[in-house]
């Protein structure tokens, strides 16, 4: 069992990484969690505009052009070869966000330092945990939008038609659904920026939760051009909201994956989904 030091109230963490068993991994975890929450509330209440980039090992492999996992051409972000796109847009863009989060895994923090010349502001686990315990929904009710893969946003919109699901989230609605390509977004990042920018220009949310894959390296920092808001990259937290999270992911252990009867899930690009904690609506 992970140490109390790394618990986030209202969640269960089944991630077995040894860093959660070492008090020296991140001694200020609880104190910085409160600072993070206060920081977000202040930013949103003051109508600030800022981007939070969540770094994962896949972003490292993408930025260093390695054929590993989701970063590999043909897997998710890119259908072309790395040589067929302008990688400088991604390597430079990844350094242009306002704040950075990264898991407390020491190996991921080492990878971050190799490709991004910025400091890590907060653990990425905060984003997962505050989706998992619904803090985001409680704190920013009526002000929160989503940016993510169209297929998962369509699914989330359907889930939000059910009172049981709205009660589970403690939320009546998301004020905006900003669609983003589920696959191959890095093939033509300028087209993606235009597509997303047109939607953002018409949006009303004060804070967006988002999960948009490795192409965010080039696109995330541009969002502020189209809409003043807080852009909070929660990565796999978007899979929680869509009811398809692998419960072994950090702080997703007791999340209920609500499922819709007769819904066509064949178009959903699952991220190692383990079909656990499912409940049919």
Regions found by a protein language model. Give the residues of each.
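Structural signal for conserved beta-strand scaffold positions within catalytic alpha/beta enzyme cores
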Residues: 101-102, 146, 176-179, 233
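Short catalytic-loop micro-motif centered on adjacent basic/acidic residues
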Residues: 207-211
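A short, acidic, amphipathic alpha-helical segment used as a generic capping/interface helix at domain edges
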Residues: 35-42, 84-88, 188-200, 215-217
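Electropositive, gly/pro-rich neighborhoods at or near active sites that engage anionic ligands
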Residues: 1-170
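C-terminal functional extensions of proteins
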Residues: 215-281
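Alpha-helix capping/helix-boundary segments
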Residues: 151-152, 214-216
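A mid-sequence, solvent-exposed acidic-amphipathic segment
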Residues: 170-206
